[in-house]
Amino acid sequence: MQQPVLTITHRMEFAGAHRMDNPGLSAERNQEVFGACNRIHGHNYTVEASLAGPLDPETGMVANLVDLMRVMREEVFEQLDHRLLNEVEWLEGVVVSAETLAVALWDRIKAREDELGAPLVCIRVCESAAAWAEYRGPAAGA
């Protein structure tokens, strides 16, 4: 009998600040495009990473959430908590938004997928309870 495919998710919170600013634009254009978000401001972010796969009949799990928790702690919390995100090396030169953060975190966690036991299928970055970006990988938008 084929095992059911399930999705498991770990959620992590961190506090970070950023400024939405495109260095290729004038100060006036940045203010016009980004408004108040052109100034340094902060969010209590929530990041969710989801893995999907068949249920392992031996363990009763898709993957061990402890592994996902560890990778997320190392790639999200330890890298971003209480930081100005624009100064994080792997975000330099990027207009830091929930969208660009979701793609960057996808790349970092996907690179460690062999440690997770199941494929990464979604990253969600929430700036608030009412605003988030979700990324499902480069093939999802094709």
What is the meaning of each model-derived region?
Residues M1-A142:
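Charge-rich, low-complexity N-terminal segments
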